[in-house]
Amino acid sequence: MANFINMYRQLLSLPLSALVKNNPIPANPIEELSLNIHQPIVYVLPYTSQTDFVIFRRNCLALGLPDPAEKNEINGVKLPRYVYLDEGRRIFKSKGAKDETTTIFNKYLELHRTSESLDVQLIPVSVLWGRSPGQEDKSDLPNLRLLNGIQKTFAAIWFGRDTFVRFSQAVSLRYMVVEHGSDEKIAQKLARVAKMHFAKQRISATGPRLPNRQAMFNKLLQSEAIRRAIEDEAKSKNISIEKAQKEAYKILDEIAADVSHSSLRAVDRFLRWLWNKLYSGIDVQNSNRVRKLALEGHEIVYVPCHRSHIDYLLLSYVLYHQGLVPPHIAAGINLNFWPIGRMFRSWGAFFIRRTFKGNRLYSAIFREYLSELFHRGYSVEYFIEGGRSRTGRLLAPKTGMMSMTLQALQHSQTRPISIVPVYVGYEHVLEVDTYAKELRGAAKEKENAGLVLRVIKKLRNLGQGFVNFGEPITLSNYLSQHFPDWKEQNHEEKPQWFTPAVNNISKQVMININKAAAVNSMNLVGTALLSSRQRALSREQLLEQLSSYQQLLQNVPYSTDVVLPNVTPQAMLEHVLALDRIGVLIEKDNFGEIVRLERSSAVLMTYYRNNIQHLFVLPSLVASIILHYEAIQKDLLLDAIRKIYPFLQGELFLHFNEDELNVQIHQIINEFARQSVINSNDNFLSINKSKVRILQLWSAGTREILQRYYITVTILQKQPAISRAELEKESQLVAQRLSVLHGINAPEFFDKAVFSSFIANLKEQRYFDESSYTVLDKIEELASTLSHLISTEICLTVKGTIEKSEDLSS
């Protein structure tokens, strides 16, 4: 019988290799699932299927996993390396798969009694043939059901490129023996648990059935909240209920997605072609976090940072290829143009207007639609920044969508809701040229199909893309920890805890996005070149600086989620030089090679520097203080950092609390000393003159930030009663003049939003009294600290400009 099965598998192998592509999830199970291939592995499959076995085995061999067709030999005993939990629909039946599996489990458990070093790993594996969830109004089952031989043949032809082999987290048999003993009941329990796992996995891979759009509309229009809003609309505008209902239907039709699985499959092929044309690869990290939440039945809300319009497509593509359901995506109404709008809608986009203010009907409908998505179990994605970042930094969060998410949790949401922050990064952003023009004052070009095609046509060889899933926030757990009253019955629409909770969670999302930063070669090369006032370094200096960056990021990690490049500085530089349209040039003279950034590309490069500015801001501040003082006591350095840190924390969403800050600063000092960038003797720090160039380049990371802070505090010293609006305006004007006089290219240097954030942080740190008057002794102390970290030339320009402004206004 065994020989016949082997022959049958060999017959299947040739057509399947032509029809079915290798699509393992995760892409590298040994690393991502932390598998120990030096211990025996047993693959657990849901049901008997020779077709599935051939596909699964081919994936195992390609991934370097043990061959499932071979047996494990333990202490002279040979046992199968795979088991089936159930019978499949097969031409050649053989009874007793369940009993055989229980017997094999028991033999493995018996071996654990006699060998303490043994730890067999059970790995659940399933082959997913297509991922259609089916429609609500149809009785068809999703394509993950048991298929017979004829059905598998058609599935291989139709779904061959859409077939995935899903490897799940290994279960340690040693752990099971220690925790539960090794009697026969444990073997049966293992089989039961594995069956439940496969059932959950099917749901997490397909998601709930797709809705009948018309039936969903009818249900929503009959909801109490929308009926009330329709009545209010009719009264306020003096129109009939019927006319208000038509308006409500029109709004709902404008908002709602119209997901089509066949459309998703088609766009998957297009996106595969697009990524291959534009990027050399998409690096995905920590997707296991999301798969775990999906298996546990969580309602998942993806909250990525927003770099590019392509973010919408990238995250859905990545999730689909990680064995997860692409989410419903909140997209700006500006993307609802022909033909893109209809296509986006079929891929899961639902459209949102820029503002709801004054439109209670729209607000009620949108809120109920979002709540309905949560209720039905669809994952959702929205961009908390509200729009794409033109500077490469995270924008301040817009809290509207988060507020509606918490309202959905309040109102009869039974499944736990987990927010998944997502860091999205690129070595080249498609729209970066447009961003630079907009920052110079050009009008924003309206989105249209021609613009999209022009952008894509021009670009290729853009390096890598990065998607890193940050630490999830389960809302019920967060609220119970920080706002224990949240579950108390309260008939107010917004109880007292609600607004602080929305603000705190939104801020924590931004912090977790930054904790999951993916550092790439462009970020590091750009940071080093922009740190030089002439935007040029010798090749040796640049490589030395890249090495210093790399060592500090490895030895003093910002967080455990940060992803670092694992190539040499030389390889980083060569990679950047090979990218198209970057503006990094090599020039040669009698003394060697100079790496230079073209002047026209300096503003573009600040975008990539700003992506990781939060990682370098503390080392940069330490370097800046030591450089300006030349020699300083550790205590004085720490004191200066504590004064400035709250503003950096607010602006760049840093995660360190006071105790963690002290630890981080000491580690940075130790690392600089280890690299011989500074001298450290007991409580005394000083520059190392032979490495002062490295220290200078490190210090540049906070140069412009401190200059901005100094502008605002100097204005407050001169005009302690100035209004907030006037303070923002005058700070911006002084910064614009400073940028012209001193050649500062950073686009965020005179951005109104960064001044607004700094002034808000001043208020939070009590630099203003209750009547909004400046607390002068505090502001003068801060001004004194800042003035020691800024060049005399800059200080004089700032003071001179402010005095001139006072003369003109008097």
From Swiss-Prot:
Pathway linked to the protein: Phospholipid metabolism; CDP-diacylglycerol biosynthesis; CDP-diacylglycerol from sn-glycerol 3-phosphate: step 1/3
Gene Ontology BP terms: CDP-diacylglycerol biosynthetic process; fatty acid metabolic process
MF terms (GO), sorted A to Z: glycerol-3-phosphate O-acyltransferase activity
Chief localisation class: membrane
Enzyme Commission (EC) number: 2.3.1.15
Gene Ontology CC terms: plasma membrane
Cysteines engaged in disulfide bonds, as pairs: none
Motif HXXXXD motif per UniProt: ranges: 305-310
InterPro entries tied to this protein: GPAT/DHAPAT, GPAT/DHAPAT_C, GPAT/DHAPAT_LPLAT, GPAT_PlsB, Plipid/glycerol_acylTrfase
Membrane topology: Peripheral membrane protein
Top-level taxonomic group: Bacteria
Record field: catalytic activity: sn-glycerol 3-phosphate + an acyl-CoA = a 1-acyl-sn-glycero-3-phosphate + CoA
Compartments (UniProt record): Cell inner membrane
Listed Pfam families: Acyltransferase (PF01553), GPAT_C (PF19277)
Family: Belongs to the GPAT/DAPAT family.
Domain notes: The HXXXXD motif is essential for acyltransferase activity and may constitute the binding site for the phosphate moiety of the glycerol-3-phosphate.
Protein name stated in the entry: Glycerol-3-phosphate acyltransferase
Native source species: Haemophilus influenzae (strain PittEE)
Protein encoded by which gene: plsB
